[in-house]
């Protein structure tokens, strides 16, 4: 096996890598990429700690999606910019713009009077009077008008979404299968469409300048290698490009970041770049190491749609925690597969810890659904929960569902239980149990809302009638409420003030940046005049009241003291297998030495990975890569949440292997659940610790062997070999004895040496030092 490769000192790595940066870092959030040579005005958005400046009563983000189609011109209730609780929120994502056939950002014909974004007017609607000084009308006019009154609120243009990732709707409402993000980023031979990406990025910059947005939010669903992921209308094109989607997605986000940085420097304001990210471990398995996070101001996790009528497994739409009882995971024998260590991944906490492995908590926002999902004719379960509801005729499954003996298509709730339904290509109702929360509140109270006729509910249709009783239930472990109609056997997964209170507290306690919700118009309030619930701001106000006195969010990636100097070592992760073949996950980690000195044989390299993966990560290259500090829950599962952020991982270069300047070393990794780019890298060599300049560009870069390592703890937890005062026993000379008085084990605090390194026992153990989570690496002898 060839372990060392030689590259020119300034060669670009193949695969994906961070870039070396030399520009001003004032106010830059920890871990955010900065375009080389551009002095980005971060301090217009962030304070000296890298935390976003919003307002004194908004220490956490409250981000609402505002949809273009609730304009009221179709006879259904309008939700306009004047209806937004501007004093309660911090960011508005306008949904959606799309990628047009010329690879440009677009909201359609901006000169048309019926264009909701730029052409519509609402005469006689209080608060919806347009600003006559702006050269456009529509939603964009009102958003700009209210932003002037509430300057703490930022607006972003969201591009894509489920329906418009691979195409767009024309002025007649017909979908144009233009290819959208897929063809804009990826050529048919799987190469990167650089021309398409640059065209789109240039148009995005021009767009936000023209309409006064503060950034771009990419809702690309989904650049994963998993077949048949995303909108079934896009499968034919997307499946043919799966092998190149992630590579081109990374390039898209890098180019957007660079062009937004350049525009920000020219305009004197920092522009935001964000995404709506999938949360399921299934989708993330096909997204490599999610190498786009470095380009994002923050990530909005779509921690909802975790269960729905696309299959028969009746469960929570947006559980906060795993319960060990998820019926979908159980059907695949997931909990009994030892490699996964009982880490359930269909919950918000798992997704949050996934991203925490590569980002500060404050650059993460969790998703909250202001809508329901549900099934009818549910069989079994506890008041429906974890029961099944398969469509009786499996030959009539909606596109993209069914076809599996394990995962059958579901029997989605319809009629009065599906107020906000989508339509299929024939114009028929898509069964999904999709409702705004104000409608589910009315169902729980036995109220037929006065709005029913404008949503097409016919009182003569039995499916549209209010029958049975909707009883409220709550899964305290999952933090998830639901409604159960025993007569109809209808299950609707919802959110209530009880679950919102728990999720708000979770955000506060874990230092998370805030929340994002889909969508503003789904929130509820009591309409006393009509005696019913309707569109309101109850839950949004609840988030505001919960957060207003919260502590600042977490602004640093590392939970340990990092070195105060850096070595110029650059890393990439590449060669992922595609789709279902990507198990176990075995990419190649490449480290390239761009330092002036060689990395000596025997040097230690350590890093953090998230507790969202098992603590069994290893390598296939003979480097002895192992977890030296396990963050695994003592319970052996993640029921009720993961208790730690990181596992600490380490490997040593063999004594004979020195990596000279310009050379690379490659290690093949081995793990079983997806993880993002590892973080908090430390090289320990020649008695000193070094961060990686690629990850910590603000640190002084020194030649390997020339520094003192600063006060960083490396992997020594504050100790060094010279500073260990306890007795160090050579393995297998155990310091503790069994009942016969024979050396047999170590207990917490005992130090043993093995293969040139010192380890400290975390608890009772008789395993090989450094072989599992019972040991903490201290230092190299």
Please annotate each region the language model reported:
Residues 581-589, 601:
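Short, solvent-exposed loop/turn segments enriched in Ser/Thr/Gly
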Residues 709-781:
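Tryptophan-rich substrate-binding surfaces of secreted polymer-degrading and adhesive proteins
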Residues 104-130, 223-430:
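Substrate-binding surface in catalytic domains of secreted glycosidases
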Residues 186-217, 252-262, 284-298:
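An active-site-proximal structural segment forming one wall of the substrate-binding cleft
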Residues 640, 644-647, 655-658, 663-710:
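Terminal connector regions
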Residues 590-597, 609-611:
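Asparagine-centered strand-capping/turn motif at beta-strand->loop junctions
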Residues 20-208, 346, 401-442, 448-458, ...:
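Glycan-recognition patch characteristic of GH18 chitinases/ENGases
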Residues 70-71, 432-552, 574, 587-590, ...:
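Extracellular low-complexity, Gly/Ser/Thr-rich intrinsically disordered linkers
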């Amino acid at each position: 096996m060839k372990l060392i490769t030689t590259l020119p000192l300034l060669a670009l790595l193949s695969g994906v890598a961070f870039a070396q940066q030399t520009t001003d870092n004032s106010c830059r959030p920890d871990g955010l990429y900065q375009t080389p040579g551009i002095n980005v005005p971060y301090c217009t958005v962030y304070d000296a700690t890298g935390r976003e400046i919003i307002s004194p009563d908004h220490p956490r983000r409250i981000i609402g999606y505002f949809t273009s189609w609730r304009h009221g011109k179709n006879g259904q209730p309008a939700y306009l910019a004047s209806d937004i609780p501007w004093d309660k929120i911090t960011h508005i994502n306008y949904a959606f713009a799309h990628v047009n056939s010329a690879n440009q950002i677009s909201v359609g014909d901006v000169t048309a009077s019926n264009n909701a974004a730029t052409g519509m007017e609402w005469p006689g609607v209080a608060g919806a009077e347009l600003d006559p000084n702006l050269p456009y009308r529509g939603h964009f006019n009102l958003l700009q008008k209210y932003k002037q009154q509430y300057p703490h609120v930022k607006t972003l243009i969201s591009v894509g979404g489920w329906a418009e990732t691979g195409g767009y709707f024309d002025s007649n409402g017909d979908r144009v299968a233009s290819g959208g993000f897929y063809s804009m980023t990826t050529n048919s031979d799987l190469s990167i469409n650089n021309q398409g990406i640059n065209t789109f990025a240039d148009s995005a910059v021009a767009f936000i300048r023209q309409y006064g947005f503060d950034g771009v939010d990419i809702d690309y669903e989904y650049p994963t290698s998993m077949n048949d992921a995303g909108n079934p209308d896009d499968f034919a094109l997307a499946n043919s490009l799966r092998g190149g989607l992630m590579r081109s997605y990374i390039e898209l986000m890098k180019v957007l970041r660079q062009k937004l940085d350049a525009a920000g420097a020219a305009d004197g304001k920092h522009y935001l770049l964000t995404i709506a990210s999938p949360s399921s471990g299934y989708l993330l398995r096909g997204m490599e190491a999610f190498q786009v996070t470095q380009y994002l101001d923050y990530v909005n996790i779509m921690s909802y749609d975790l269960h729905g009528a696309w299959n028969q497994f009746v469960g929570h739409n947006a559980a906060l925690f795993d319960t060990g009882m998820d019926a979908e995971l159980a059907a695949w024998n997931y909990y009994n597969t030892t490699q996964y260590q009982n880490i359930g991944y269909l919950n918000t906490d798992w997704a949050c810890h996934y991203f925490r492995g590569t980002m500060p908590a404050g650059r993460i926002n969790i998703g909250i659904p202001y809508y329901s999902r549900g099934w009818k004719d549910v069989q079994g379960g506890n008041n429906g929960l974890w029961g099944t509801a398969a469509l009786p005729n499996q030959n009539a499954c909606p596109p993209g569902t069914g076809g599996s003996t394990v995962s059958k298509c579901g029997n989605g709730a319809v009629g009065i239980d599906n107020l906000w339904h989508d339509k299929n290509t024939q114009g028929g109702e898509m069964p999904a149990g999709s409702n705004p929360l104000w409608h589910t509140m009315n169902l729980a109270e036995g109220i037929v809302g006065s709005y029913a006729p404008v949503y097409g509910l016919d009182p003569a249709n039995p499916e549209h009638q209010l029958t049975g009783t909707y009883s409220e239930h709550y899964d305290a472990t999952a933090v998830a409420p639901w409604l159960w109609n025993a007569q109809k056997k209808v299950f609707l997964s919802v959110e209530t003030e009880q679950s919102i209170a728990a999720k708000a507290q979770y955000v506060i306690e874990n230092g998370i940046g805030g929340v994002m919700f889909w969508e503003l118009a789904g929130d509820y309030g009591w309409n006393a005049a009509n005696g019913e619930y309707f569109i309101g701001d109850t839950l949004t106000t609840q988030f505001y009241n919960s957060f207003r006195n919260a502590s600042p969010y977490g602004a640093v990636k590392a939970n340990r003291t990092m070195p105060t100097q850096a070595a110029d070592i650059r890393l990439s992760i590449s060669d992922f297998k595609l789709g279902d073949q990507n198990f176990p996950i075995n990419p190649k980690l490449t480290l390239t030495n761009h330092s002036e000195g060689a990395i000596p044989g025997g040097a230690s390299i350590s890093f953090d990975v998230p507790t969202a993966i098992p603590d069994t990560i290893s390598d296939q290259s003979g480097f002895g890569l192992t977890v030296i500090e396990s963050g695994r829950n003592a319970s052996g599962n993640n029921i009720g949440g993961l208790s730690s952020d990181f596992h600490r991982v380490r490997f040593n270069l063999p004594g004979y292997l020195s990596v000279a300047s310009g050379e690379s070393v490659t290690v093949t990794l081995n793990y079983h659940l997806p993880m993002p780019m590892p973080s908090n890298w430390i090289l320990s060599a020649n008695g000193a610790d070094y961060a990686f300049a690629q990850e910590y560009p603000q640190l002084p870069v020194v030649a390997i062997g020339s520094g003192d390592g600063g006060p960083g703890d490396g992997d020594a937890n504050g100790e060094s070999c010279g500073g260990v005062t306890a007795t160090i026993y050579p393995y297998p000379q155990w310091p503790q004895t069994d009942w016969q008085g024979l050396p047999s084990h170590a207990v917490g605090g005992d130090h043993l040496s093995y293969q040139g390194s010192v380890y400290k026992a975390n608890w009772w153990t008789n395993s090989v030092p450094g072989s599992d989570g019972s040991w903490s690496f201290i230092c190299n002898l």
